[in-house]
Each structure stands twice: as structure tokens, then as C-alpha cells.
Amino acid sequence: MGSDSEILNRELSKLSDEDLLACTKEELVNRLRKEESDKMSALIQRGRLIKEVNKQLQGHLLEIRELKVINQRLQEENQELRDLCCFLDDDRLKVKKLAREWQLFGHHAAKVMREDLGGYLKKLADLERMQDGLVKENLDLKELCLVLEEECVSRSDSSPGGSTDLNIPCMVARDVGDGSSSTGSVGSPDQLHLVCSPDD
């Protein structure tokens, strides 16, 4: 029995002719059906495995297609970013150049303004000195007019022809300004000569 069960557990293809002849028809039929059933189960299992592998392959192919689409989109975005970077870099260089030009212009303008301001300050100082000189000159002329007026009045009072007519022109010659206006020139020697000229 031990040898018979061992023979049954072995595949038919691995049995020798003597072992096959030793088996009965029922044993051979059962053995054959068992092997066919095992082979069918193996084929079914293999088919399932193939379907599973195909399904996984389809999933991988779909994932690869999606990755290709994503890669293409990323390449396009990368190219757009490159173009944008080039544009921004050109714009940056233009702005940098413009800023440098404005800086040079600012330095030049500041230099010119300093020079002009220095000239204006010098002219202002000269004008102030001239104004001070004119004020002093007007004060001197005013004092001179007062002296000449007093002299004219005294000469008019001492003349025998009457002093009323001569006193009025002498009073007109007085400068009532503050010494800084142009009317202070009324007391110039030429005009005083005309005013007080009856005795000349």
C-alpha cells in the first residue's frame, strides 16, 4: 500500500512504464483527472495573475501618460518662467542703467545748483553792500540837503527883496524820505543850484 500511495502521489509523466502497468485503469483515470484538474487550476491561477499583471501594467501606463502630460506642462511653465526671467533681467538692467543716469544727472544738477547758488549769494552780498552804500550816500545827501536848505533860508532872510517867495522853493527841496528812496536825489547840487539860484 505504501508503494501504491507513493505512486499515486507522483505525476504520470514521472512514472516509469512498470509503475504505469502496475496501476489499474481506475487509478490511472483518477490520476489523469486529478492532474487535469490541477493543471486547470494552475491555468486559472495563471490567468488571474496575468490579468492582475495586465491591470497593474495598464495602471502604470496610465500613470506614465499622466506623468508625461504633467512633464510637458512643467516644461512649458519652465520655458515661460525662463522667458519671464530674461524679460525681468532685461528690465532690471534698463532700470539700473536709468538709475545710474539719473544719479549722474542728479550729481550734475546739484553741482550746477551749488555753483548757481554761490553766484546768487555773491550777487546778493554785492547788492547788499551796494544798498548799504546807497543808504549811506542818501543819508549823507540828506544831511547835505539840510545844510544847504538852512544856508538857503538864512541867505533868503538876509536878502532885502523879501523872503516869502524864496522860502517856499527851499522848503520844496527837502527830502521827506528815509534815505533809501530815489527821491533823496532831489538834494543834489544841480537841483539845489536851481532852487537857491536867485542870488547867483
Swiss-Prot record:
Gene Ontology terms: biological process: negative regulation of DNA-templated transcription; neural tube closure
UniProt keyword annotation of Secreted present: no
Major location category of this protein: nucleus
Coiled-coil segments on the chain, per record: 57-84
Region (Disordered): 178-200
GO cellular component, one term: cytoplasm
Subcellular location: Nucleus; Cytoplasm, Cytoskeleton, Microtubule organizing center, Centrosome; Cell junction, Adherens junction
Keyword annotations: Cell junction, Coiled coil, Cytoplasm, Cytoskeleton, Nucleus
Residue ranges with Low complexity bias: 178-188
Effect of a null allele: Morpholino knockdown of the protein results in neural tube closure defects and a disorganization of the neuroepithelium. This developmental phenotype is associated with an alteration of cell-cell junctions.
Tree of life domain: Eukaryota
Function: Functions as a transcriptional repressor. May inhibit the activity of CTNNB1 in a TP53-dependent manner and thus regulate cell growth. May function in adipocyte differentiation, negatively regulating mitotic clonal expansion. Plays a role in cell-cell adhesion and epithelium development through its interaction with proteins of the beta-catenin family.
Assigned protein family: Belongs to the CCDC85 family.
Protein known as: Coiled-coil domain-containing protein 85B
Organism from which the protein derives: Danio rerio
